[in-house]
Amino acid sequence: MSLTSRLYKLRLSSLHSFGSLPILPPPLRSSRIAAPLSLRVSLSTRSIATSIAMGEAADAGMDAVQRRLMFDDECILVDEVDRVVGHESKYNCHMWEKIESGNMLHRAFSVFLFNSKFELLLQQRSATKVTFPLVWTNTCCSHPLYRESELIDENNLGVRNAAQRKLLDELGIPAEDVPVDEFTPLSRMLYKAPSDGKWGEHELDYLLFIVRDVAVHPNPDEVAEIKYVNREQLKELLKKADAGEEGLKLSPWFRLVVDNFLPKWWDHVEKGTLSEAVDMKSIHKL
């Protein structure tokens, strides 16, 4: 049994009191029709050199799947008013030294998926994640990539496309179950948070809400555990995290949303009035 499997099985028993859902093997993924590319993105000399030196630069203990994503994925660099200024590898975007020295900021998104009972789907990040392993967070948190389909600004379509892609990658939710026009982008926030001495986040984060009943089949390379929570169960989870019980931790971006926005937005979810909460003109610096 691999180290990843042992860590994964060990963590599955940590929070059963919250009604955790079992992890099932991910389904076979259907082929995805890519949008025709009119935008041609060439690798910079820096990116090529990084790829060549990947084996030397990467931590020896980094999981192979996470290593591939760290070097292959190109994040979208933006300024503090969300204008695209370039692109960089996921690896470099999450190195705390580069974040601090170059103020490197990239675009991200956080999905909050509710079922028809208005329960919020949470995930615990896998033990092999490079940043914030084994922390509990909202449904899905990731980055649009520097590709034509995820750079579309109109109606925030690029970010919606990225959210749909990652819900399949991480949670096995097919694209047809989460249509892009069902996502409601509510606002944006800008935050910075260290993960450990080497890694961290500096993101301009799009906050996307969606209400759908979906079948979830988590990918164990990305997700250790999932659970649906109502408001009271989330409060209990927060209390345990604040008290440090059972080693429970929450992601910093999720906690920022919980503390600043989630209660009032949850009200709108229950009332069916999410459109009234939309404020995409603001970028909240937290």
Curated annotation (Swiss-Prot):
GO terms for biological process: chlorophyll biosynthetic process; dimethylallyl diphosphate biosynthetic process; isopentenyl diphosphate biosynthetic process; photosynthesis. Its EC number is 5.3.3.2. PROSITE patterns: NUDIX. GO terms for molecular function: isopentenyl-diphosphate delta-isomerase activity. It is an enzyme of class 5 (isomerase). InterPro entries: IsopentenylPP_isomerase_typ1 (IPR011876), NUDIX_hydrolase-like_dom_sf (IPR015797), NUDIX_hydrolase_dom (IPR000086). The keyword Transmembrane helix does not apply. It comes from the Eukaryota. CDD domains: NUDIX_IPP_Isomerase (cd02885). Residues 104-256 form the Nudix hydrolase domain. PANTHER family: ISOPENTENYL-DIPHOSPHATE DELTA-ISOMERASE (PTHR10885:SF0). Catalyzes the 1,3-allylic rearrangement of the homoallylic substrate isopentenyl (IPP) to its highly electrophilic allylic isomer, dimethylallyl diphosphate (DMAPP). This is Isopentenyl-diphosphate Delta-isomerase II. It comes from Clarkia breweri. The lineage of its organism: Eukaryota, Viridiplantae, Streptophyta, Embryophyta, Tracheophyta.
